[in-house]
């Protein structure tokens, strides 16, 4: 079996950046597995990796790829986006991850790196510089983070001498390829809603530039393959290491786009919760997924920042792109996308 073969599950936002960084290294066989071919990434990287398609909720699809490619390392980034039906998260994040673990064990994979979420420890209360000792709540705020917590648990419990595993809890990803965070903030600008603010904007938040998150996955892989795999069975918070007030990040995005709100109308958190509750009830009766929820209010009003000392010590992780430069690169990419 080739010694340096890496299979990336998911070729989207994070997976694509991991593949790009892997392609910068020498002596690697690289493959990606996704529901559909990422033709844009294949074209960009000129065939430097192999693309497999299939459904990770189907064990046969997974095993077919493992049998053909023989990965030494698997980096599992695949996950549905936010605001989908509950069943989808459990099918993909929980059942799909279980399928990947089984295939890793069956085909003698050496290392599995899993993309978890910093949100797995969030229950609506403030998270102030918390580290990996923070307990996972018994009751989660949403199905996405509940399913990610269960998948993370499976991955860590699968760690052994033969299959080394690690999970990375990434926080607030943004960057080129982002289809959620920054585009969502720019849609607020487009809709003329920048003057509205939930909460007092005294809550500190962690965001993570995508290239830093990708880099952390490669560091975890390197550690697990080393003669001293200190990351085995471990979980790590990954951020930019630069906290910022929640609404300041949004306003930095808007400022880079040439807009400064002329004034601010503040809605206290209790008012936001009341409005979100009403919106959820209306959508319940209309059988629609609500866009404005109590979870979003709590998310945007709470302190949510994390201590990355463990990642620095064990993985030797240090962000390679700072927050301001990350915002600049993201908006430059979005400008380029508009022209095509």
UniProtKB/Swiss-Prot annotation:
Entries under Gene3D superfamilies matching the protein: NAD(P)-binding Rossmann-like Domain
GO molecular function, one term: 3-beta-hydroxysteroid dehydrogenase [NAD(P)+]/C4-decarboxylase activity
Pathway(s) of this molecule: Steroid biosynthesis; zymosterol biosynthesis; zymosterol from lanosterol: step 4/6; Steroid metabolism; ergosterol biosynthesis
Active site: 144
Keyword entries, A-Z: Endoplasmic reticulum, Lipid biosynthesis, Lipid metabolism, Membrane, NAD, Oxidoreductase, Steroid biosynthesis, Steroid metabolism, Sterol biosynthesis, Sterol metabolism
Annotated compartments: Endoplasmic reticulum membrane
First-listed, main subcellular location of the protein, grouped into a coarse class: endoplasmic reticulum
The reaction(s) this protein catalyses: 4beta-methylzymosterol-4alpha-carboxylate + NADP(+) = 3-dehydro-4-methylzymosterol + CO2 + NADPH
Membrane-topology descriptor: Peripheral membrane protein
Keyword Lipid metabolism: yes
Source domain of life: Eukaryota
One GO cellular component term: Golgi apparatus
InterPro entries, per the entry: 3Beta_OHSteriod_DH/Estase, Lipid_A_modif_metabolic_enz, NAD(P)-bd_dom_sf
Sites where the protein binds NAD(+): 148
Keyword check for RNA-binding: no
GO terms, biological process: ergosterol biosynthetic process
E.C. designation(s): 1.1.1.170
Family that this chain belongs to: Belongs to the 3-beta-HSD family.
Purpose of the protein: Sterol-4-alpha-carboxylate 3-dehydrogenase; part of the third module of ergosterol biosynthesis pathway that includes by the late steps of the pathway. The third module or late pathway involves the ergosterol synthesis itself through consecutive reactions that mainly occur in the endoplasmic reticulum (ER) membrane.
Comment field (misc): In Aspergillus, the biosynthesis pathway of the sterol precursors leading to the prevalent sterol ergosterol differs from yeast. The ringsystem of lanosterol in S.cerevisiae is firstly demethylised in three enzymatic steps leading to the intermediate zymosterol and secondly a methyl group is added to zymosterol by the sterol 24-C-methyltransferase to form fecosterol. In Aspergillus, lanosterol is firstly transmethylated by the sterol 24-C-methyltransferase leading to the intermediate eburicol and secondly demethylated in three steps to form fecosterol.
Assembly with partners or alone: Heterotetramer of erg25, erg26, erg27 and erg28. Erg28 acts as a scaffold to tether erg27 and other 4,4-demethylation-related enzymes, forming a demethylation enzyme complex, in the endoplasmic reticulum.
Name of the protein in question: Sterol-4-alpha-carboxylate 3-dehydrogenase erg26, decarboxylating
Native source species: Schizosaccharomyces pombe (strain 972 / ATCC 24843)
């Amino acid at each position: 079996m080739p010694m340096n073969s890496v299979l990336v599950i998911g070729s989207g936002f994070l997976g694509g950046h991991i593949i790009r960084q892997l392609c910068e290294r020498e002596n690697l066989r690289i493959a990606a597995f996704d529901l559909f071919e990422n033709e844009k990434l294949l074209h960009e990287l000129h065939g430097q990796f192999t693309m497999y398609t299939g459904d990770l909720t189907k064990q046969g699809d997974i095993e077919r790829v493992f049998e053909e490619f023989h990965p030494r390392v698997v980096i599992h980034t695949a996950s549905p986006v936010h605001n989908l039906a509950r069943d989808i998260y459990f099918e993909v994040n929980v059942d799909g991850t279980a399928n990947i673990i089984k295939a890793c064990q069956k085909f003698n994979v050496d290392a599995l790196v899993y993309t978890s979420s910093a949100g797995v420890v969030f229950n609506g209360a403030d998270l102030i510089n918390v580290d990996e000792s923070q307990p996972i709540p018994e009751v989660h705020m949403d199905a996405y983070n509940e399913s990610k917590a269960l998948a993370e648990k499976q991955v860590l419990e699968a760690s052994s001498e033969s299959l080394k595993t690690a999970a990375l809890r990434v926080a607030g990803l943004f960057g080129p390829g982002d289809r959620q965070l920054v585009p969502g903030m720019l849609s607020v600008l487009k809709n003329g809603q920048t003057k509205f603010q939930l909460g007092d904007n005294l809550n500190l938040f962690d965001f993570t530039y995508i290239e830093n998150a990708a880099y952390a996955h490669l560091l975890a892989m390197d550690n697990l393959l080393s003669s001293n795999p200190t990351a085995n069975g471990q979980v790590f918070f990954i951020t930019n290491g630069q906290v910022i007030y929640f609404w300041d990040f949004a306003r930095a995005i808007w400022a880079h786009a040439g807009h400064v709100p002329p004034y601010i109308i503040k809605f206290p958190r209790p008012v936001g919760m009341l409005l979100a509750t009403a919106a959820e009830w209306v959508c319940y009766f209309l059988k629609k997924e609500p866009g404005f929820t109590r979870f979003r209010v709590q998310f945007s009003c709470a302190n949510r920042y994390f201590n990355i000392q463990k990642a620095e010590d064990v993985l030797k992780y240090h962000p390679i792109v700072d927050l301001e430069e990350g915002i600049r690169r993201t908006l430059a990419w979005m400008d380029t996308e508009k022209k095509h």
